[in-house]
Amino acid sequence: MVKTETKHSDAEQLVRTKLDELIEFRSQTDDIKEFWGKQFDLGLAWVQYPEGAGGLGINPKYQLLVTEKLREEGISQQNRVANILGIGMGAPTIIEYGTPEQISKYLRPMFTTDEIWCQMFSEPGSGSDLASLSTKAVDDGDGYIVNGQKVWTTLGHLAKWGLLVTRTDPDVPKHRGLTFFIVDMESDGVEVRPLRQITGEAEFNEVYFTDVKIPKENILGSLGEGWRVSLTILMNERVAIGGNVRERGSGAPGPVSYTHLTLPTILLV
């Protein structure tokens, strides 16, 4: 019991010390993205993640100390809303399945909202049956060539990166022939078509892939592991969306609307 309490005390003190440094940094910048970058570098983005990946390698319960302190200081935490598909769903999935290089490359600009993320699951002909998807990725030696279509892609027109599930092996049971990729949404052959709502807004999109080349280092997880990665992302989605619910009648914008209202300019408040 004493040992456990000591560990708790040490972890709490570590977070509070880091928070003091972060709050002090606030007086040095009016750029909220720079502030979020400092938060990441101090390990206060996700305290449970490894050091160097926005975390401190400690129990996630200590993240509450960070959240409460930033709220107390009146500092915006809306990056978690503006880039909810990245921070809420992409980050934990990349931590679980990504390579060290992927973790190093993607997480920091994701947290600062310099790079917005989307996910691409649904297809016009597959309905709710994810395993029946038909978007194909064919090995051409040093990468994969992707052809197909996705639909209902939230924030696809704003995203720099997308999480894409494809079929890489048509000759095995459908759940086993899937592979996940991290795709650059600015790649040649990627076409994003906004789906206009009656309000005139376009939160959702169709995304077309025509001979899109994706390097092999952009595979997330292992070849053929796409079904497992998909289930992880969907689990993370429930947690992320549930944690950002707005009270009905509050007048506060939801996660997607907030992104439209604030990007590309977000101010420190």
Identify the meaning behind each predicted range.
Residues 135-138:
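A structural signal for short hydrophobic beta-strand segments in well-ordered beta-sheet cores
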Residues 1-84, 95, 101-105, 109-112, ...:
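Amphipathic, small/basic residue-rich leader segments at the start of a protein or domain
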Residues 186-213:
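Flexible, small-/acidic-enriched active-site or ligand-binding loops
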Residues 235-237, 241-258:
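A conserved active-site cap/scaffold subdomain adjacent to cofactor or substrate pockets
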Residues 259-265:
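Conserved small/polar residues in nucleotide/adenosyl-binding loops
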Residues 113-121:
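A short, Trp-centered hydrophobic/proline-enriched beta-strand micro-motif
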Residues 212-229, 234:
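Long, acidic (Asp/Glu-rich), low-complexity accessory segments flanking structured domains
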Residues 147-193:
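A short core secondary-structure module
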